[in-house]
């Protein structure tokens, strides 16, 4: 069953000078994506990182099992991380220690979702069974 983990709303009080710098660093976002891919045991196909002006970074890792993306808003001490997998053996929550190590957030809020719940119904309709 496809799985997704969304991590949002990061703040940092103990490392206020480091944290926004990491969130605005294309190199830090790229390294985090590479480490997340390794931690989740997925197959990297492509990785792109885009810095924004005047501030912020978006990075996406396209993996054989789906994708991982990071969007940062350093001015708010905020990052949104989405990890989507569809292979079944992957564990998106394995990325949490990596995120803590790469960005040192004070708090990480997560939401786990299951995707593809309606797949059987949609396949049945597409095949003329519905």
Residue ranges and their predicted role:
Residues 1-130:
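Polybasic/polar functional segments that serve as interface/processing modules
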């Amino acid at each position: 069953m496809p799985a997704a983990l969304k991590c949002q709303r990061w703040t940092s009080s103990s490392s206020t000078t480091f944290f926004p710098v990491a969130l605005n660093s294309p190199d830090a976002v790229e390294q985090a994506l590479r480490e997340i891919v390794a931690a989740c045991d997925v197959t990297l196909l492509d990785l792109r990182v885009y810095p924004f002006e005047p501030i912020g970074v978006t990075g996406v890792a396209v993996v054989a099992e789906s994708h991982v993306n990071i969007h940062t808003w350093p001015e708010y001490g905020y990052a949104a991380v989405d990890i989507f997998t569809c292979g079944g053996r992957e564990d998106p929550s394995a990325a949490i220690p990596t995120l803590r190590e790469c960005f040192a957030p004070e708090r990480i809020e997560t939401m786990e979702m299951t995707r593809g719940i309606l797949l059987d119904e949609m396949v049945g309709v597409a095949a003329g069974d519905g």
